[in-house]
């Protein structure tokens, strides 16, 4: 892997082994000539180690580096501090441009066209005899043109450079031009990089405050930590990639090795370009000068441009883009959703200050952008009149309430697919519900961050005189870091992952494997670590305002809770509990002290778990001592009931209220009617006696008087009574006869009198036209049927048959007027009881109660939810 090599490590040197001590093979890029690379050394050893041979250029480079300090002293004495600072600032800018633009252009053309290699071959720079001369010609004396003299000089100089630099056993002509060109190229890289580093260090040194009070503070301590970390990054990076990649060797020839991800390369993407520049910011902290910080930001940013336009394209052409089929899973899911749903369009996404996937025909996009525009314009036009305290409360409440709303949706969706069910039961599709969620989530992010930006901006504006410029810039850097994290996260997991697609469309996931590509190679939950650094950046920008600290804490806590208690359990449920160790985790666990601490914690955890398990076993051991008869509650209840019935019969031999076949059947599945046999002594019977049907939970323990209404679920005991109450309550009387001692009869409760709710019920025999209870039946169960859901056709058939028996189906449509006890809610419960899904009343009204549409819609919803399981 090619890597940048600037700043601190060049002054420290490498503690790693020389690359030549390892048996490495290489080959040229175009001609595929195989060779063994020679022994080379890192930059600092090559220039300053007196035990190594030095070429002319290396001596000149070392002299140029040392001369900078003498020049600094002379200019300082003659022109003063400010002029010297700007003098070396201009030098640094020159060398930085020479690095990023100069070396960048050279490497660009070398990568695409092998320009340097072809130039060396064309002009025979590393050949014994030039290609255009025969063996008997004298190249140095017979070359009269300026061009030939020039290339003859270059040829001799380059060969002299390599011979004076390399060991005696190095055969210049035995190696291909690529390796020799690379050795010469290294010399110019040494000059530019060392000058870039030294001029920057001198500029920083001249910017350090003279007051000891300004130097010895928390900023300097943090700065030293960053510098030391930067040194470790450089040393570890050189240990991993050696100077083959340190000097962009793969632009010239290829070693037989793969891209390496070890050590510091497990901590951060492109560590030499990212965390490899933390020393810049450490020095800026020590100086406490925003001008130094701006220069450092310029140097770092230009390095990212070098990475983007030079190194990354070359790495992708040489090694591939580093993605595999698993890493592209989410992207393929996005494509699949678009392919299978023609009305689906990619969601609007806010990234930094821009919006992606804007759809001019989608109203919600205008609503989102309009909200931002209205808030911004309103703030600008009324900035003087805005009360910051009220605005703070608004930001806090908006963030908290909207987060609770978002978290509730995700939690309930994870537990029961609640959000998807809500839309399915109202006639919408699974993907449509996902689109609505995408809008809600993006609007939540846009709204909360817009309010945060407005509040922070007004805070800075109202206290600008007290704002530290360096803190302001550092805060903006943290904001940029969070924006970068968001973009890298979305790049790694695509729109599907960004919008928690596995909560809503888990049936689209073909491979149950978490991605470890991109930023997820280094962090398991980047949004939890780097996803709030920008908010803490606002704390810096506002000079540690208490209100901004409160908002930053709120952002951090809500983010942590969402990841820890909602996202992580759901991910474990979908992808399994396979523990994914991040690159940072691997590196930290590789450090011996931390590994020892981790082992101690694991041992303590195992001891605690073992003790809890042993205690649980001891506490549960008493259950085994209970007699078996006491553990069978059902059998015990049956014995109690039989004993009570026996006592009641002896006390009143002519009082009886029994359900027909109650010994055989205690659970009646609708629409099965329930027939009741009753018997009453002749002296107690009244023609107005009636029997009501009640839920046991409603009547409770009141056995003498019924204190709840029957709601129409009652029947007379005689056909001659209750003439003004319609036929329904008399037609249920199927038999009645009297003897000298008692009156007995039969009453049948069919679908016109029964409840259409699952539950435990009982019959109550009431005396006369009152609610005084004479007899109570044995409790029994009524349940809705489970219709055949094998196919949508069978489900429709069973549904229509049931509705016909209940007398609520006419012309294939549901008509609840036929049975006042079977309404829309009963139909919803019937469908839910059979197929496990629920349709909304609004949807069933919208389709005119069509049994065919309703049954097939419920079937489709079941198929969708089953695929999400």
UniProtKB/Swiss-Prot annotation:
Q: What class of enzyme is it?
A: transferase
EC number from the UniProt entry: 2.1.1.17
Disulphide bridges: none
Q: Where mainly found?
A: endoplasmic reticulum
InterPro entries linked to this entry: Phopholipid_MeTrfase, Phosphatid-EA_MeTrfase_fun
What is the membrane topology noted in the UniProt record heading this document?
Multi-pass membrane protein
Q: Does Transmembrane helix count among this protein's keywords? A: yes
Pfam family of this protein, just one?
A: PEMT
Q: Name one GO biological process term.
A: phosphatidylcholine biosynthetic process
Q: Write down the chemical reaction(s) this protein catalyses.
A: a 1,2-diacyl-sn-glycero-3-phosphoethanolamine + S-adenosyl-L-methionine = a 1,2-diacyl-sn-glycero-3-phospho-N-methylethanolamine + S-adenosyl-L-homocysteine + H(+)
Question: Any stretches that span the bilayer, and where are they?
Answer: 56-76, 87-107, 188-208, 213-233, 259-279, 292-310, 363-383, 390-410, 440-460, 464-484, 535-555
The record's GO molecular-function terms, alphabetically, read: phosphatidylethanolamine N-methyltransferase activity
Task: State which ranges are Lumenal (membrane side).
Answer: 2-55, 108-187, 234-258, 311-362, 411-439, 485-534
Per the record, the pathway is: Phospholipid metabolism; phosphatidylcholine biosynthesis
Keywords, A to Z?
Acetylation, Endoplasmic reticulum, Lipid biosynthesis, Lipid metabolism, Membrane, Methyltransferase, Phospholipid biosynthesis, Phospholipid metabolism, S-adenosyl-L-methionine, Transferase, Transmembrane, Transmembrane helix
Give all N-acetylserine modified positions: 2
| Side Cytoplasmic, residues | 77-86, 209-212, 280-291, 384-389, 461-463, 556-869
Q: Which residues form a coiled coil?
A: none
**What HAMAP family does the database record attribute to this sequence?**
PEMT
Quote the function comment for this protein. Catalyzes the first step of the methylation pathway of phosphatidylcholine biosynthesis, the SAM-dependent methylation of phosphatidylethanolamine (PE) to phosphatidylmonomethylethanolamine (PMME).
Q: Which family does it belong to?
A: Belongs to the class VI-like SAM-binding methyltransferase superfamily. CHO2 family.
Q: Which PANTHER family match?
A: PHOSPHATIDYLETHANOLAMINE N-METHYLTRANSFERASE
Q: What is this protein called?
A: Phosphatidylethanolamine N-methyltransferase
Q: Which organism is it from?
A: Saccharomyces cerevisiae (strain AWRI1631)
């Amino acid at each position: 892997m090619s890597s940048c090599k600037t700043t601190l490590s060049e002054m420290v040197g490498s503690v790693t082994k020389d690359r030549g001590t390892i048996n490495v093979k290489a080959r040229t890029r175009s001609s595929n000539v195989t060779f063994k690379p020679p022994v080379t050394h890192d930059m600092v050893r090559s220039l300053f180690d007196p035990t190594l041979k030095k070429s002319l250029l290396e001596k000149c480079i070392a002299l140029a580096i040392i001369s900078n300090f003498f020049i600094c002293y002379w200019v300082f004495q003659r022109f003063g501090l400010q002029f010297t600072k700007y003098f070396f600032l201009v030098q640094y800018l020159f060398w930085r441009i020479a690095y990023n633009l100069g070396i960048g252009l050279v490497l660009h053309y070398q990568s695409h066209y092998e320009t340097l290699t072809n130039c060396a071959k064309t002009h025979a720079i590393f050949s014994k005899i030039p290609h255009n001369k025969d063996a008997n010609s004298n190249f140095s004396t017979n070359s009269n043109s300026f061009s030939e003299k020039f290339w003859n000089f270059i040829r001799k100089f380059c060969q002299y450079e390599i011979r004076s630099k390399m060991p005696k056993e190095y055969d210049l002509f035995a190696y291909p031009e690529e390796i020799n060109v690379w050795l010469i190229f290294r010399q110019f890289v040494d000059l530019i990089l060392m000058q870039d580093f030294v001029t920057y260090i001198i500029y920083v040194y001249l910017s350090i405050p003279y007051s000891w009070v300004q130097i010895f503070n928390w900023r300097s301590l943090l700065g030293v930590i960053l510098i030391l970390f930067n040194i470790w990054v450089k040393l570890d990076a050189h240990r991993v990639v050696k100077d083959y990649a340190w000097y962009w060797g793969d632009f010239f020839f290829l070693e037989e090795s793969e891209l390496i991800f070890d050590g510091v390369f497990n901590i951060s993407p492109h560590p030499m370009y990212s965390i490899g520049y933390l020393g810049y910011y450490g020095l800026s902290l020590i100086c406490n000068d925003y001008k130094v910080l701006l220069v450092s930001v310029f140097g770092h940013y230009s390095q990212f441009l070098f990475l983007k336009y030079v190194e990354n394209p070359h790495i992708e052409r040489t090694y591939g883009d580093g993605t595999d089929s698993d890493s592209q899973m989410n992207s393929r899911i996005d494509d699949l959703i678009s392919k299978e749903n023609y009305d689906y369009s990619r969601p609007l996404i806010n990234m930094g200050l821009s919006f992606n996937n804007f759809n001019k025909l989608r109203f919600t996009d205008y609503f989102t952008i309009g909200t931002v525009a209205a808030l911004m314009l309103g703030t600008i036009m009324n900035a003087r009149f805005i009360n910051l305290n009220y605005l703070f409360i608004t930001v806090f409440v908006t963030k908290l309430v909207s987060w609770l709303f978002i978290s509730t949706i995700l939690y309930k969706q994870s537990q029961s697919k609640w959000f998807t069910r809500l839309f399915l039961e109202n006639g919408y599709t699974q993907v449509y519900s996902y689109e609505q969620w995408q809008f809600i989530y993006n609007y939540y992010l846009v709204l909360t961050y817009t309010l945060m930006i407005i509040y922070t901006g007004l805070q800075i504006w109202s206290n600008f005189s007290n704002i530290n410029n360096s803190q302001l810039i550092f805060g903006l850097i943290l904001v940029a870091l969070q924006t970068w994290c968001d973009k890298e996260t979305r790049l790694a997991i695509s729109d599907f992952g960004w919008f928690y697609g596995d909560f809503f469309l888990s049936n689209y996931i073909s491979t149950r494997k978490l991605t470890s590509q991109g930023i997820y190679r280094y962090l398991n939950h980047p949004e939890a670590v780097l996803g709030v650094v920008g908010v803490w950046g606002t704390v810096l920008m506002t000079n540690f305002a208490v209100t901004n600290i409160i908002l930053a804490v709120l952002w951090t806590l809500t983010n942590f809770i969402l990841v820890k208690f909602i996202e992580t359990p759901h991910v474990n449920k979908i992808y399994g509990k396979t523990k994914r160790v991040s690159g940072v985790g691997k590196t930290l666990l590789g450090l011996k002290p931390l590994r020892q601490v981790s082992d101690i914690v694991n041992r303590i955890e195992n001891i605690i778990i073992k003790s809890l398990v042993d205690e649980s076993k001891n506490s549960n051991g008493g259950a085994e001592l209970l007699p078996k008869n006491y553990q069978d509650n059902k059998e015990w209840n049956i014995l109690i009931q039989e004993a009570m019935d026996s006592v009641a019969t002896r006390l009143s031999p002519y009082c009886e209220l029994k359900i027909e076949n109650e010994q055989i059947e205690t659970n009646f599945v609708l629409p099965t009617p329930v027939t009741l046999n009753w018997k009453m002594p002749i002296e107690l019977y009244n023609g107005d006696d009636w029997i009501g049907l009640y839920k046991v939970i409603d009547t409770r323990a009141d056995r003498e008087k019924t204190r709840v209404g029957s709601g129409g679920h009652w029947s007379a005991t005689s056909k001659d009574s209750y003439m003004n109450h319609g036929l329904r309550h008399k037609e249920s009387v199927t038999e009645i006869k009297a003897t000298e001692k008692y009156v007995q009869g039969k009453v049948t409760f069919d679908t016109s009198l029964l409840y259409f709710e699952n539950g435990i019920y009982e019959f109550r025999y009431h005396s006369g036209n009152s609610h005084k209870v004479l007899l109570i039946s044995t409790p029994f169960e009524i349940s809705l049927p489970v219709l055949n859901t094998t196919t949508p056709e069978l489900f429709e058939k069973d549904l229509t048959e049931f509705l016909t028996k209940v007398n609520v189906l006419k012309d294939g449509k549901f008509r609840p007027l036929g049975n006042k006890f079977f309404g829309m809610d009963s139909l919803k419960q019937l469908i839910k009881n059979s197929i496990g899904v629920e349709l909304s009343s609004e949807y069933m009204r919208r389709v005119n109660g069509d049994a065919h549409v309703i049954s097939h819609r419920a079937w489709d919803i079941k198929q969708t939810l089953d695929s999400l399981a």
